[in-house]
Amino acid sequence: MKVSIVEPRGVIWEGMSKQVILPAADGQMSVLDLHQPFLVRLKSGRIKTSGIETKIKEGIAFMRANELKIVVEV
């Protein structure tokens, strides 16, 4: 899936990944390739994907058409 992690100042990371781990408001969430569409609120924690780890304060993530877009405050 295509993954974009962005914050107000610009793109943090963009690329292809088979799995992304998100700090969802209701608990840790693992998103795999071809996941069903969703919109989820993120809490303070770490986003992990393709060998990178990004610490965030909060944000939202949405999946559609095998693209995961993550908008965060770091």
Question: Which residues does each PLM region occupy?
Answer:
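Compact, glycine-rich, soluble single-domain proteins
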Residues: 2-74
